[in-house]
């Protein structure tokens, strides 16, 4: 006699296939998926529980899927081919490095199980001023830069960035923004981040428009 699968089993299989497609597409569009963010948690858990299947989807394309357990709780889609990585504009890179630095500083003072790292626009502007940049980032420019970082699941604004006390949630994925990060040594990574920021410093009066050039 031929063995027939139950409708319930068929629905479960279809749901699994759909989740694989949904998660794979999400990684392609956003590079990271986070277990600590409520609307991404199901996708992160799917990658965690079906890592081999997810990797099998991307392997023929030359991508690797890396899983970072707690405390990071992140899955990353990585392509090592030259020219295939996401390219950030100069001020996007600067903002990313500033948020990375602030994340490292804040994380040291938070409880190990803290889910959120929040920084204020004032803290961001203070770090930017140290770099002698040619202009202060206004609200519109900052919000435009944040759209890119949000797309790649690096950070997101908490509401409108309308004042110095407005907040930005910084995701642990900023730690993975620099290659070969030593995730166990926050002090070393802070120093490294400041070194990277130093490459963008400009003397007073330099004429550079925000957002020009690539990182």
Language-model segments: which ranges?
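Short, amphipathic alpha-helical interaction segments positioned at domain boundaries
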Residues: 87, 171-207
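Long, low-complexity, intrinsically disordered segments
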Residues: 206-215
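A short, conserved structural fragment
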Residues: 61-67, 150-161
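Accessory beta->alpha helical hairpin/"wing" motif in late/C-terminal subdomains of nucleic-acid enzymes
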Residues: 75-77, 156-181
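Short amphipathic alpha-helical interaction segments
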Residues: 49-53, 135-151
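Eukaryotic partner-binding/assembly regions in large regulatory complexes
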Residues: 1-81
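Short alpha-helical segments that sit at the start of domains
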Residues: 79-115
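Short acidic, hydrophobic short linear motifs in intrinsically disordered regions
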Residues: 34-42, 109-128
